[in-house]
């Protein structure tokens, strides 16, 4: 998969932000993921729509290994169609929406959230837009 978007934040993640990815699901199956990373190399949150099984999977990679997957069978995405995926966070969970429909709620496994300093979007699908939006204090001291 190709790196389509990467953002760094020296101040780290805080509740109240959202990441929205819009594109067209025109490539092969299972070629899209979003990763929230720490400076230590952990993946604090990994979300991947799996077209082959019509599921959305959330997980975390900490201490050199993957945790237990959380899987949602709510899957409003279709290959060959435009898509929108949004990930937002509050103090307890990541919330994942696809086509404006909530598909997964994933509890924070990595704390403090401020140690999450990078977000990457990898995709072989055509992406039209990737946007980080603030709702109050979000990424550290306001810097992306």
Curated annotation (Swiss-Prot):
<comment type="subunit">
    <text>Homodimer.</text>
</comment>
<feature type="domain" description="Galectin">
    <location>
        <begin position="5"/>
        <end position="133"/>
    </location>
</feature>
<dbReference type="InterPro" id="IPR013320">
    <property type="entry name" value="ConA-like_dom_sf"/>
</dbReference>
<dbReference type="InterPro" id="IPR044156">
    <property type="entry name" value="Galectin-like"/>
</dbReference>
<dbReference type="InterPro" id="IPR001079">
    <property type="entry name" value="Galectin_CRD"/>
</dbReference>
<feature type="modified residue" description="Phosphoserine">
    <location>
        <position position="138"/>
    </location>
</feature>
<dbReference type="GO" id="GO:0030246">
    <property type="term" value="F:carbohydrate binding"/>
</dbReference>
<keyword id="KW-0597">Phosphoprotein</keyword>
<keyword id="KW-0430">Lectin</keyword>
<dbReference type="Pfam" id="PF00337">
    <property type="entry name" value="Gal-bind_lectin"/>
</dbReference>
<protein>
    <recommendedName>
        <fullName>Grifin</fullName>
    </recommendedName>
</protein>
